[in-house]
């Protein structure tokens, strides 16, 4: 028989200091630029190594405050599919977090099966870290070869 327990609410991290922040990214290098993610983490001041996880576990990690930031920057030509992100975005937002593209715009689900209007990548974090994360993305982008 199933064990009944009271549900526990989840909440994104309250971490405000990027040096103490933890970040996660996709395991798969085939469709994601881990080097660019490392550059963003460095520009943000994150000192920890990335937590590399599969699927929507990344969103769950941010929603539970196991990670403070999730970043994914797809390689040129790769199209993000909505089913890889939709449920995770809802979970992070319900936990008090923010999910946007790398330009700071909320994800647009109206383009069919792909996130056609995606600006460079996807980030998920707390409201406390989002603006600084956007600054780090911009700084990394201006010095990258992507």
Regions of interest found by a model, annotated:
Residues 9-146:
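An extended, acidic
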Residues 1-5:
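DPxDG-like acidic metal-binding loop motif
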